[in-house]
From Swiss-Prot:
UniProt keyword annotations, A-Z: Capsid protein, Viral capsid assembly, Viral genome ejection through host cell envelope, Viral genome packaging, Viral long flexible tail ejection system, Viral penetration into host cytoplasm, Viral release from host cell, Virion, Virus entry into host cell
GO terms under cellular component: viral capsid
Primary location group: virion
GO biological-process terms attached to the record: symbiont genome ejection through host cell envelope, long flexible tail mechanism
A Pfam family per the record: Phage_portal
Family: Belongs to the phage portal family. HK97 subfamily.
Oligomeric and partner information: Homododecamer; forms a ring-like structure through which genomic DNA is translocated into the capsid. Asymmetry of the portal protein is induced upon binding of the large terminase and DNA. Interacts with the terminase large subunit; this interaction allows the packaging of viral DNA. Interacts with the capsid protein.
Keyword Iron set for record: no
Subcellular location: Virion
Function: Forms the portal vertex of the capsid. This portal plays critical roles in head assembly, genome packaging, neck/tail attachment, and genome ejection. The portal protein multimerizes as a single ring-shaped homododecamer arranged around a central channel. Binds to the terminase subunits to form the packaging machine.
Cysteines joined through disulfide linkages: none
Protein name: Portal protein
InterPro entries named among the record's database cross-references: Phage/GTA_portal, Portal_HK97
Length: 424
């Protein structure tokens, strides 16, 4: 049987030369013995007749919206590398830097930077961890990042070293910290993050069961289960089989008829509770808020607008609340993880990655105009800095900070002194 070929080279092909080489370059094969337990990674189980797994949970609209909202918005924010000199002056690193080019444009041969960050953040939202295989050049610079399946990774502490064991079909490979870029959610030990979807399994299972119940209800022609009463008449085995065959449609089969004629004292009655009795709509509405809480997403961003004003009266305030309470932890984890795993040790303290949040913080035109005016008049931003945020070309002389000439110290108020030349 031909051995499978993989697009992601983990340096663990089964050929003897690859096996021998892997001992010297890393990623060596290991035997699939018992690995460490780092808590639940994914969601699996049953609730009644409903099967619960990762794919089924992602089909819940609330979960899909929460995961896609966080991952897509985080990936849309510009992520650049900055350099800080000895005087604490910062400037953006140009694309001659391999890491800056990788984070801004192409982290690997088949993904854009946005697609890579989107996939990594999605796994971080879903599993609480995201992993990428790091490829470096001879100088130690990162030149490629390939995302890995979080559910296939086992992280354990061996002595004082962290070992990443990755499983691919029947293959196992061990990697060192230098070879893996690790995004972690919050967790007990700091070794790995906790999986939101694993801890939300019960709540998600209720949502799955309610969807399955409604699906079966409407597939049955919106008819509740029926019981057929024969009165005091006792049927033989043959008669019972015949009655079941004749009346299986009335018990919820796909055949729809306008009139049924019941003879010999037969009668039907519904059993179980109706969707109205079970308050299905109220229960499903509660599950929307319940699942949104696991991801920290405001309910109004997943379609529950009943209490949207609690997050602010305007779109700017709601965006600010979403940024502060939901996106900021993910943004900080990205920046800190890049600093920890991807910045060379010789550049720590000099280089750092940072997101540009201006696009997300934009409000309406009137609010933006007032903000820009205040920043310009106070000298906190130059004209070209403000034009750059709107993708407008620079103006000659627009790189000089300015402020109102009549501003004077409060100690000079009521005097005829000229405004002091403070260099503004």
């Amino acid at each position: 049987m031909e051995e499978p070929k993989y697009t992601i080279d983990l340096r663990t092909n089964n050929g003897w030369w690859a096996r021998l080489k892997s001992w010297f370059v890393g990623g060596r094969l290991v035997t699939p013995n018992q690995g460490s337990q780092t808590g639940p990674v994914s969601a699996h189980g049953y609730l009644g007749d409903s099967s619960i797994n990762d794919e089924r949970i992602l089909q819940i609209s609330t979960v899909w919206r929460c995961v896609s909202l966080i991952s897509t918005l985080t990936a849309c924010l510009p992520l650049d590398v900055f350099e800080t000199d000895q005087n604490d002056n910062r400037k953006k690193v140009d694309l001659s830097n391999p890491l800056a080019r990788l984070l801004r444009y192409s982290p690997n041969q088949y993904m854009t930077a946005q697609e890579f960050r989107e996939a990594m953040t999605m796994q971080l939202c879903f599993y609480g961890n995201a992993y990428a295989l790091v490829d470096r050049n001879s100088a130690g610079d990162v030149i490629s990042l390939l995302p890995l399946q979080s559910a296939n990774m086992d992280v354990k502490l061996v002595g004082k070293k962290v070992v990443y064991r990755y499983q691919r079909d029947s293959e196992y490979a061990d990697f060192s910290q230098k070879e893996i870029f690790h995004l972690k959610g919050f967790g007990f030990t700091g070794l790995v993050g906790l999986s939101p979807i694993a801890f939300a399994c019960k709540s998600a299972g209720v949502a799955v069961a309610m969807e399955d119940q409604q699906r079966d209800f409407f597939a049955n022609g919106a008819k509740s289960p029926q019981i057929l009463s024969t009165g005091e008449k006792v049927l033989t085995e043959q008669q019972r089989s015949q009655v079941e065959e004749n009346f299986k449609e009335i018990a919820g089969g796909p055949v729809k008829k306008r009139l049924w004629i019941l003879e010999a004292g037969f009668s039907t009655s519904a059993i179980g509770v109706t969707p109205q009795d079970a308050e299905m709509m109220a229960s499903r509405k509660f599950q929307v808020s319940e699942l949104a809480r696991f991801f920290g997403v405001p309910p109004h961003l997943v379609g529950d607008v009943e209490k949207s004003t609690s997050w602010g009266s305007g779109i700017e305030q709601q965006n600010l609340g979403f940024l502060q309470y939901t996106l900021q932890p993910y943004i900080s984890r990205w920046e800190n993880s890049i600093q920890r795993w991807l910045i060379p040790s010789k550049d720590v303290g000099r280089l750092h990655a940072e997101h540009n949040l201006d696009g997300l913080l934009r409000g309406d035109s009137a609010s933006r105009a007032a903000f820009m005016k205040a920043m310009g008049e106070s000298g906190l931003r130059t004209i070209n800095e403000m034009r750059r945020t709107d993708n407008m070309p620079p103006l000659p002389g627009g790189d000089v900070a300015m402020r109102q000439a009549q501003y004077v110290p409060i100690t000079d108020l009521g005097t005829n002194k000229e405004p002091r030349n403070n260099g503004a």
